[in-house]
Amino acid sequence: MSTEHKQYLSAVTLAAIGVVYGDIGTSPLYTLRECFSGHYGFDVRPDVVFGFLSLIFWMLILVVSVKYLTYVMRADNAGEGGILTLMSLAGRNTSSRATSILVVLGLIGGSFFYGEVVITPAISVMSAIEGLEIAAPALDPYIVPCSIAVLTLLFVIQKHGTGSVGKLFAPVMLVWFLTLALLGLRSIIANPEVLAALNPKWAISFFVEYKSVSFFALGAVVLAITGVEALYADMGHFGKFPIRLAWFTVVLPSLVLNYFGQGALLLKNPEAIKNPFFLLAPDWALIPLLILATLATVIASQAVISGVFSLTRQAVRLGYLPPMRIIHTSEMESGQIYIPVINWTLYLAVVLVIIGFERSSNLAAAYGIAVTGTMVITSILFCTVAWKNWHWNRFLVVFLLMVLLIIDIPMFSANVLKLFSGGWLPLSLGLVMFIIMTTWKSERFSLLRRMHEHSNSLEAMIASLEKSPPVRVPGTAVYMSRAMNVIPFALLHNLKHNKVLHERVVLLTMRTDDVPYVHNVERVTIEQLSPTFWRVVARYGWRETPNVAEIFHRCGLEGLSCQMMETSFFMSHESLILTKRPWHLFLRGKLFIALSRNALRAPDQFEIPPNRVIELGTQVEI
């Protein structure tokens, strides 16, 4: 390995530590404390401490190290990961019915992420700020205002991008993980018998001894692996090897040392359960640790916010969410984006959650159900990919799925039991997003099908125009066409009302391919349909934002010259009229109309100069 490659690998691995592992890296702030919360009724006794530590350790090994880093990360689409990517891969070689089921599962998983993303910033920052009550108990009433203030600042700076401050994320998180390791190691040295919990017999004995109560406690243990989906979702940014290298060399050892250090502290001083993380530190280090913890939780929150921006863009490009304003905050990094409506909706939800739950311990009950639900779906989708796409032995796939679900389903079931103590929150938020995504996709499909049914053949219309040509005016007209062989509504209305055509007519169709990026040489396909008609198909990946200026530039390179300021863009604007429906479909239709009215207009989507756009309205019944 060359020196340059080693330096590059080190830099990417460090960057992965700063972004990928923020959520799971801040879990020690609250996980072990929640295991002994009043919900489960466990006393701080050695066998219970050993049991929880053993469960946490083997959860990190089996779920993170084996399931995600060894298996799930094999499933990539041109290097990209994430639940929607896995959904797309799983549906490539299955029947239409199976594909529909897999799509529903993928959308449920994506919806769970929206539910989780509201909780992560709130519980992370609150857990860090709660260190104030250890340093100065009189400051306890200020935990909620301080948490809101920190998160307000974080959401405000989103529109400016995080490129400059983002360079500090990796060093800060590296210091954080080293601090976790040192604090834990210091406590373990004072009480080394805690290392006995590495033996899985303690986890097994815990279940045997405490039976059903130990099953309920899985709802707290799972907090140790929240954020595990980020490893897969961020695979496209950093690559598989750097993410794996960061986990096994820095993150996993630091987490294990800190959890076991907290356990050693509890063996020595059971009263430390009120906040075992901060009580690991000597008195002189408490304030610096509080500041570092706050920075780490802010970085973890930033990673989650960036993740929801990326997921939203992917959902928009794949047609599961209406078009919305997406702002690129960096000229160098295409992945750095800002979506105002998502940013401020998320901010409002996070603030309401902090005010409503008041303490991170109250919010912990809501955490986990979305994470474990996504884990179950990930296992099913991954095994489908292994069977249908990679042609693994069917019996091997069934065995692997059973092993994965033996781990996933008990954790999900334990969290479902927390439904009425907070679990309803991510489920409700996820349900809202699922309804929005399925409504937009299905109603949009029905609308386009209805419009196509009432449209004539494009080839027949062109042939008719060649035989009986209308009046021609100078210039080029571009008509946005959703389907290649269908006459755009705007073209029909222009002929009907104005009875003229431009000298040159371009039918432009935007296509989103099932890949993150499309090579420039494959960007544009040009076909001349007649002496005056051209069809242009522009292809983009779901990580890209279409741009008409770029399309025209590519057209010019291939012989079709179009000057933006000398071209008129004709677009249709549909006014939707709701027909008589059953009540549930009526409500869905109302939601679709509301989403359509607030969707980003096509000129803004494709960055077309407003003074070159002509919109023609039409009424469509749905």
UniProtKB/Swiss-Prot annotation:
GO CC entries: membrane; plasma membrane
Topology term for the membrane: Multi-pass membrane protein
Transmembrane domains' residue ranges: 9-29, 46-66, 101-121, 137-157, 165-185, 213-233, 247-267, 276-296, 337-357, 363-383, 395-415, 416-436
Main localization (coarse): membrane
BP-aspect Gene Ontology terms: potassium ion transport
KW Chaperone (keyword) present: no
Catalytic activities: K(+)(in) + H(+)(in) = K(+)(out) + H(+)(out)
Keywords on record: Cell inner membrane, Cell membrane, Ion transport, Membrane, Potassium, Potassium transport, Symport, Transmembrane, Transmembrane helix, Transport
Recorded GO MF terms: potassium ion transmembrane transporter activity; symporter activity
Protein location: Cell inner membrane
Cysteine disulfide partners in this protein: none
Functional summary from the UniProt entry: Responsible for the low-affinity transport of potassium into the cell. Likely operates as a K(+):H(+) symporter.
NCBIfam families: kup (TIGR00794), PRK10745.1 (NF008015)
Similarity section: Belongs to the HAK/KUP transporter (TC 2.A.72) family.
Protein's name according to its UniProt entry: Low affinity potassium transport system protein Kup
Organism of provenance: Yersinia pestis
